[in-house]
A protein has these predicted regions:
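Alpha-helical transmembrane segments and immediately membrane-proximal extracytoplasmic
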Residues: 1-176
């Protein structure tokens, strides 16, 4: 508080700036306490989720990753887009599978989550082949024809959607 009082008379904008940063930091801490799985790197967290090491609630993780990414972006912190995109994809994969019933078992759940994580990486980096290799080699560590089909279809859908949205809104796909 004494630090902010020193700026009171000379630079009120600087004091307001530091207060805004403190408010954003507090909001970020509240979000990360509410959704602890949204903390840290997205790719290692997604790998832990798929291997059963990390437990998470998909909706909290989805909202927490998006909210914390937006807050850190507006606070001026550097943010890489591939990690959050992979974690958003994995949480959406779990959410879609659970909303549609999830009766096909744990293996199908992991296939859907792996495909969606690969789709998130493909949409973030616009490199579909790399996304397929990341999903198969790094995230899942196993190979099966069903997994290959799930990952390929998800990655191709994400790439096509990103490019179509770029053409529709006349925006370079690097901004998505």
């Amino acid at each position: 508080a004494a630090f902010l009082l020193r700026f009171r008379g000379t630079a009120p904008a600087a004091a307001l700036f530091f207060l805004a940063l403190a408010a954003l930091a507090f909001l970020l801490s509240v979000i990360l306490k509410w959704a602890p799985s949204a903390n840290g790197g997205g790719i290692p967290t997604a790998m832990g989720i798929l291997r059963g090491i990390v437990t998470f609630k998909w909706l909290r993780t989805f909202v927490g990753v998006i909210a914390s990414s937006v807050i850190t972006f507006f606070a001026g912190m550097p943010l890489c887009n591939d990690g959050p995109s992979v974690l958003i994809g994995a949480s959406l994969g779990r959410g879609v599978n659970s909303l549609l019933g999830g009766k096909k078992g744990a293996a199908w759940d992991r296939y859907v989550m792996t495909g969606c994580a690969g789709a998130g990486f493909a949409a973030a980096t616009m490199s579909p082949l790399t996304a397929v290799f990341i999903a198969l080699e790094e995230i899942h560590k196993k190979f099966s024809p069903m997994l290959l089909m799930a990952v390929f279809s998800s990655v191709l859908s994400a790439t096509a959607t990103t490019r179509l949205l770029g053409e529709l809104f006349k925006v370079d796909t690097a901004f998505f």
